[in-house]
């Protein structure tokens, strides 16, 4: 009897253990699995161009380094599982490189991108960046000199791309507003010489067609939007997320691009400002516009033109007599400062040389008035609402969420970071900074003494008062951004340079418009 009881207990124990093991096995098999990423991240541009989409988002830490930026291994871990990742034994291409040269109005920049193409979509592994001055447009009629000015940048590209990859690494040169304003004849000669120099003296295959060209302002803005939102992880990440608006301020033009949202019974008005984009399996309807002639350097010239025209009206300057140098007071300079030898271009054949000097007392509000004036807010608005110059723009207040980011970069960054503004600030803080700078040296010491390098920056560049007032006018008066709205700025995100170049480089991973060079030029 005792033995039978032991046997029954033993059988019960074995049964319980077996049931427990089965339960654990069932729970294990029901555990959620890592899902595969979308297979077809593509950008559809209006002219049918298929652009490989971005990889899984790079981490969102913002690193502000020196002008030379190198990003290492930020995204490779994101695509190692799921159907999007090709096995290394199946993939024979390995890494691909793209060389993109940004020929801007004030300088040229090279970006060398390295992608792991054994993932779908390709993974951005590395970026090498460097810039130099002056820009191609400064060479005017010296087309050969303009082409050779790119040699230091191309040497950096040669060093960044392995020797055995160079003959299959496409290169493109995209010029922006500065070259556009030289006129068709001069700019065409410069671009032709640049293409010739690349084809004859470097091993990189030059992209056919518009590989060496002046980029359309529409493309410039949209590619900048793609770059910023890709690096922020807002696009190409699977699910559709809110996107950031971008405001890019160059030397010759400025771009605005954002994704407005409308009530169900409304939609964006059709027109050249409307840009339909497909990226990472999601559709985006963007508002974009490139305001040619409203980059920082052109803004300076417009404000100084107002002062020269007043001087012509009063007889201080004799119209048409451009051989001499004139002396004028400017409210856009701090007291006690001068800006000598400034070239004020009224027209192609009417360029005055002026020594500007600051007033006896600060005149920042008068400078702001001039900055507002050149925006032509009173221009006829055929399709309301409008930003400036009669250009239609959906209201950022009513169609863009307050919780979504507004990113301002390029000259916005260059004029705020040396003076101590953080990477996130309100438009009111930018306006206060402009007022402080315009007040002059008497207040600079107490405000900027603790910010390394700021006093020397202000001393060597007297135009910061003008520049900051122009930026405040552009954002507040022009784009109607409230003073309390928070702005974000950056030069890089995860060590990758902001701007249009990354977005424009993605199509070049496909060789539809270029082919490897058979004979290498080393």
From Swiss-Prot:
Entry's Gene Ontology cellular component terms: Golgi membrane
Pfam annotation, one family: GDA1_CD39
Catalytic activity: GDP + H2O = GMP + phosphate + H(+)
Skewed-composition ranges (Basic and acidic residues): 65-75
Name of the molecule in the record: Guanosine-diphosphatase
This protein's record includes keyword Membrane: yes
Pathway: Protein modification; protein glycosylation
UniProt region (Disordered), positions on chain: 35-89
Superkingdom of source: Eukaryota
Family: Belongs to the GDA1/CD39 NTPase family.
EC number(s) per entry: 3.6.1.42
Any GO BP annotation: protein N-linked glycosylation
Catalytic site: 220
Transmembrane segments: 7-26
Residue ranges, Cytoplasmic side: 1-6
A molecular function GO annotation: UDP phosphatase activity
Keyword Membrane listed: yes
Topology relative to the membrane: Single-pass type II membrane protein
Stretches of the chain found on the membrane's Lumenal side: 27-522
Polar residues composition bias: residue spans: 76-89
UniProt keywords, alphabetically: Golgi apparatus, Hydrolase, Membrane, Signal-anchor, Transmembrane, Transmembrane helix
Annotated function: After transfer of sugars to endogenous macromolecular acceptors, the enzyme converts nucleoside diphosphates to nucleoside monophosphates which in turn exit the Golgi lumen in a coupled antiporter reaction, allowing entry of additional nucleotide sugar from the cytosol.
Protein's cellular compartments: Golgi apparatus membrane
Protein's organism: Kluyveromyces lactis (strain ATCC 8585 / CBS 2359 / DSM 70799 / NBRC 1267 / NRRL Y-1140 / WM37)
């Amino acid at each position: 009897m005792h033995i039978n009881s032991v046997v029954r207990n033993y059988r019960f124990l074995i049964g319980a253990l077996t049931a427990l093991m089965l339960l654990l096995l069932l729970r294990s098999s029901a555990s959620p699995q890592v899902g595969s990423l979308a297979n077809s991240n593509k950008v559809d541009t209006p002219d049918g161009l298929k652009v490989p989409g971005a990889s899984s988002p790079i981490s969102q830490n913002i690193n502000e380094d020196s002008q030379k930026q190198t990003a290492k291994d930020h995204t490779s871990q994101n695509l190692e599982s799921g159907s999007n990742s090709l096995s290394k034994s199946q993939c024979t291409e390995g890494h691909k490189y793209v060389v993109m040269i940004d020929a801007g109005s004030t300088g040229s920049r090279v970006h060398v991108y390295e992608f792991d193409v054994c993932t779908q979509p390709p993974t951005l592994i590395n970026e090498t960046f460097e810039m130099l001055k002056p820009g191609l447009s400064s060479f005017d009629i010296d087309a050969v000199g303009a082409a050779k000015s790119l040699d230091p940048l191309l040497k950096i590209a040669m060093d960044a791309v392995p020797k055995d990859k160079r003959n299959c690494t496409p290169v493109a040169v995209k010029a922006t507003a500065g070259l556009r304003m030289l006129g068709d004849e001069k700019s065409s000669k410069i671009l032709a010489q640049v293409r010739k120099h690349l084809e004859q003296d470097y091993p990189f295959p030059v992209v056919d067609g518009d590989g060496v060209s002046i980029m359309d302002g529409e493309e410039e803005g949209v590619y900048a939007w793609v770059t910023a939102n890709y690096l922020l992880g807002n696009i190409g990440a699977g699910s559709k997320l809110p996107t950031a608006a971008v405001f890019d301020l160059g030397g010759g033009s400025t771009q605005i691009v954002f994704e407005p949202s409308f009530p169900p019974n409304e939609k964006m008005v059709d027109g050249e400002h409307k840009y339909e984009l497909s990226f990472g399996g999601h559709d985006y309807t963007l508002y974009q516009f490139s305001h040619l002639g409203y980059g920082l350097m052109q803004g300076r010239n417009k404000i100084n033109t107002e002062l020269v025209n007043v001087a012509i009206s009063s007889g201080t300057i004799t119209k048409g007599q451009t051989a001499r140098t004139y002396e004028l007071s400017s409210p856009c300079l701090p007291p006690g400062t001068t800006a000598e030898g400034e070239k004020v271009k009224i027209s192609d054949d009417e360029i005055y040389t002026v020594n500007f000097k600051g007033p006896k007392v600060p005149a920042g509000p008068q400078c702001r008035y001039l900055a507002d004036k050149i925006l032509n807010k009173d221009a006829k608005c055929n399709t309301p609402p409008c930003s400036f110059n009669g250009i239609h723009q959906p209201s950022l207040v009513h169609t863009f969420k307050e919780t979504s980011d507004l990113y301002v970069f390029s000259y916005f960054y260059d004029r705020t970071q040396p003076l101590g503004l953080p990477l996130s600030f309100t438009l009111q803080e930018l306006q206060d900074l402009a007022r402080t700078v315009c007040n002059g040296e008497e207040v600079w010491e107490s405000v900027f003494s603790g910010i390394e390098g700021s006093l020397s920056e202000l001393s060597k560049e007297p135009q910061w008062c003008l520049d900051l007032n122009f930026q405040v006018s552009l954002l507040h008066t022009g784009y109607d951004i409230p003073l309390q709205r928070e702005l974000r700025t950056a030069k890089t995100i995860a060590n990758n340079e902001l701007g249009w170049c990354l977005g424009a480089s993605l199509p070049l991973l496909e060789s539809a418009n270029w082919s490897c060079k058979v004979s290498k030029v080393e």
